């Protein structure tokens, strides 16, 4: 059995400095007014786009131990996440990304749950809209989701998103520590596509692993998108 172990500590600033969405833009109309495109200045962002006097970013620290089983082509991880609420808001839940669920036939986002179809669709979209007959074995398997003391946390998974309900309100300036144990089978990147996976080299008898978005990670919480 060939197993590789690695430890990772990450700091990620969850930015509130994103550009506001502009659904009303004509995208290419040379006479379009700029009033709806430029973000409205506020205490968080000035008209120039520079941080304002009340600018904030939420923060997430990750302490990750990961094991790569090359024979089974499986990645197993245990991570401790420290989430800092620097926003002025009270938070009673948080969201995480489970990107690897897009590789699953039962957890991915490709097929609609609605009984209706859009007015315009393709043969490929019709094929992917069929519910799969069985699980193809891919996607994130959550082994444990607990707080820092080991108490189970209530969570809900919606395709590639996971919502964790906090045991108590997370106020401004406070932090919440939780742990997640997980694993997933690594897909063939050449066959299935995507940013991460393995590429097999039969002549060498080994695989090349190019892993991206490989661990459960915090979603951005911002002042204008929530």
Regions found by a protein language model. Name each.
Residues 51-53, 64-67, 151-153, 165-169:
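Beta-strand-rich interaction surfaces with strong enrichment in secreted/lumenal proteins
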Residues 79-81, 85, 98-100, 174-188:
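Short, hydrophobic/aromatic-enriched beta-strand segments in well-ordered soluble domains
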Residues 1-21:
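Bacterial Sec-dependent N-terminal signal peptides
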Residues 160-164, 176:
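Short strand-edge motifs at loop-to-beta-strand transitions and within beta-strands
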Residues 73-102, 107, 118-123:
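Ligand-binding face of N-terminal immunoglobulin V-set domains in extracellular IgSF glycoproteins
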Residues 17-75, 205, 212-215:
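N-terminal, polar/Ser/Thr-rich
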Residues 93-94, 106-109, 156-157, 188-197:
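Short, solvent-exposed loop/turn and secondary-structure capping segments
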Residues 34, 118-144, 148, 181-226:
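Extended, low-hydrophobicity, Ser/Thr/Pro/Gly-biased non-transmembrane segments
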């Amino acid at each position: 059995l060939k197993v590789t172990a690695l430890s990772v500590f990450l700091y990620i600033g969850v930015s509130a400095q994103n550009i506001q969405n502009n659904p009303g833009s004509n995208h290419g109309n040379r006479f379009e007014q700029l009033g709806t495109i430029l973000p409205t200045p506020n205490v968080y962002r000035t008209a120039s786009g520079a941080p304002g006097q009340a600018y904030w970013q939420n923060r997430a620290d990750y302490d990750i131990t990961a094991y790569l089983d090359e024979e089974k082509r499986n990645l197993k991880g245990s991570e401790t996440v420290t989430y800092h609420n620097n926003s002025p808001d009270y938070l009673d839940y948080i969201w995480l990304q489970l990107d690897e669920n897009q590789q699953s036939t039962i957890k991915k986002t490709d097929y609609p749950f609605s009984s209706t179809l859009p007015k315009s669709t393709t043969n490929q979209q019709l094929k992917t809209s069929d519910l799969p007959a069985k699980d193809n074995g891919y996607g994130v398997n959550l082994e444990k989701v607990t707080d820092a003391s080991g108490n189970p946390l209530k969570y809900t998974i919606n395709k590639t998103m996971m919502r964790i309900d906090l045991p108590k309100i997370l106020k401004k300036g406070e932090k919440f520590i939780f742990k997640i144990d997980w694993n997933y089978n690594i897909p063939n990147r050449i066959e299935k596509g995507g940013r991460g996976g393995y590429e097999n080299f039969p002549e060498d008898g080994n695989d090349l692993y190019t892993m991206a978005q490989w661990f459960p990670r915090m979603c951005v919480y911002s002042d204008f998108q929530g």
